[in-house]
Regions:
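Aromatic-rich, lipid-facing transmembrane alpha helices and their immediate juxtamembrane interface loops
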Residues: 1-151
Length: 151
């Protein structure tokens, strides 16, 4: 069951991450364009093919991190999740640039570090981390329950 559970969680978090990113970029673009002569009510976001496996890797963090800290203070957990996300975002962006020649999200605005992470996204990453924590706890419980009744 461990392999099946990990695979299902990988697919779940890949889809959740891609969906969240598309919503975030659509909202960001709509807000950024507000007030310009070309303002549109189009809700059009974007993501990259590389993000599917990157977001899927969240499934490996559940047993390592979430299971250990989910009962801690919410602010401490949010901070830890943001630091982990920033670290993974920096590493994956750097690796993509090294191996493919470009980082698809290379930041040029805001408080960025080498273009790989934006510190001004910390609150968004804190919220995303807490959301992922709850999804992981729920999905893990459902999968464990299902496996217990359907071995």
């Amino acid at each position: 069951m461990h392999f099946k559970k990990t695979l299902l969680l990988f697919l779940l978090f890949a889809c959740v991450g891609i969906t969240a990113e598309i919503f975030f970029t659509a909202i960001y673009d709509a807000v950024k364009q507000h007030g310009t002569p070309h303002f549109s009510l189009k809700f059009q976001g974007q993501s990259y093919i590389w993000m599917f496996p990157i977001y899927g890797c969240i499934s490996f963090m559940g047993p390592i991190l979430v299971d250990r800290i989910h009962s801690w203070n919410i602010f401490l957990r949010a901070l830890i999740y943001a630091v982990v996300i920033f670290s993974f975002e920096f590493l994956s962006g750097w690796l993509l640039e090294v191996f493919t020649g470009s980082c698809p999200w290379k930041y040029r605005e805001g408080l960025h570090i080498a273009g790989y992470i934006r510190l001004d996204y910390a609150v968004a990453w804190m919220g995303f981390g807490l959301m992922v924590e709850q999804i992981y706890l729920f999905a893990s419980k459902v999968l464990d329950h299902f496996h217990a009744h359907h071995p």
